[in-house]
């Protein structure tokens, strides 16, 4: 789900503007009154949180376009990760892939709930 944010959603500029390759996931965020801009960047081997804002709640960005996580916080993640990947001593690989356990079935709980005919169990 969070990979789609990068591949075709609000964090798409990681691919297009910053030319980032490999598997990435992320979540952009903006708080009320454009006070804070967030970006959570996830790679197979590293998780990053970027926040741009002020401790004083009276401080805020002038507009929604400037206060969005994709506008203010995402570029910090992109530039940081470009430098991480350039530094071979750190050992991070831009071509790493997300690893799932062999027996992982994201729909198993749905099938069990439907078999029990208890739709409420799905939403607990």
Please report, for each region that a protein language model flagged, where it lies by residue.
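A penicillin-recognizing enzyme superfamily signal
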Residues: 1-123
């Amino acid at each position: 789900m969070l990979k789609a944010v990068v591949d075709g959603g609000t964090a798409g500029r990681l691919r297009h503007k910053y030319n980032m390759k490999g598997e990435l996931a992320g979540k952009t965020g903006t708080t009320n009154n454009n006070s804070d801009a967030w970006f959570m960047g996830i790679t197979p081997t590293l998780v990053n949180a970027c926040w741009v804002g002020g401790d004083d709640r009276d401080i805020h960005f002038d507009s929604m376009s400037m206060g969005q996580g994709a506008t203010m916080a995402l570029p910090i993640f992109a530039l940081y990760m470009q430098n991480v990947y350039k530094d071979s001593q750190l050992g991070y690989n831009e071509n790493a892939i997300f690893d799932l356990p062999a027996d992982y079935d994201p729909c198993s709980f749905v099938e069990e709930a439907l078999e029990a005919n208890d739709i409420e169990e799905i939403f607990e």
